[in-house]
Amino acid sequence: MNVLVETERLIITEMTMDMAMDIHKNSLDEDTRRFVPDEVFETLEDAKETVEFLMSQYGSTDGPLVYAVILKVDDTNIGYVQLVPIGEGKWEIGYHVAKAYTCKGYATEAVKAFLPLMAKRVGIEEVYGIRLLENVSSGRVLEKCGFETFFEGEGEYHDGVYGISKSVWKL
């Protein structure tokens, strides 16, 4: 395992092909379908193809830079944290924790450990957090991690126009 960073409860590490089944299963809950539909992997093969691509990005500063979030206590893969380029010099934070592990502070813990380290590594000073307004839990994660909201209203999100919130974090 090529560990990026550890916290009290989590290991944030590069993905490996043997994680594809967990990534597939973790992506299938209704919250993922509603809030990040482009990150649902309907088949194991879809997950494998994505993991293979993400693995090819390690060592790059172009992104996307996606890392698995593993529970230390039992080595369970509970999700991921990521930085994704969204335009010239602009990056977005993303995170997902499997439904069975939500509301335990894991997303906040992962983002707090991952973000400053990766921002320095990639050489960026601002990172954006974009979420659907109805995804209140994601808003709490961003707030706890020091993001400041600068827009709430109608905006483009994935394949349409929805009520969204945009926040920014500065190094």
Annotate each language-model stretch with its function.
Residues 1-34, 66-171:
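Acyl-donor (CoA/ACP) binding surface of acyl/acetyltransferases
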Residues 15, 43-45, 58, 161:
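A short hydrophobic/aromatic micro-motif that marks alpha-helical segments and, especially, helix-coil
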Residues 31-53:
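Conserved GNAT-fold acetyl-CoA-binding loop/helix
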Residues 41, 60-63, 127:
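Secondary-structure boundary/capping residues
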Residues 54-68:
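A short helix-loop-beta-strand connector motif used in the catalytic cores of GNAT acetyltransferases and
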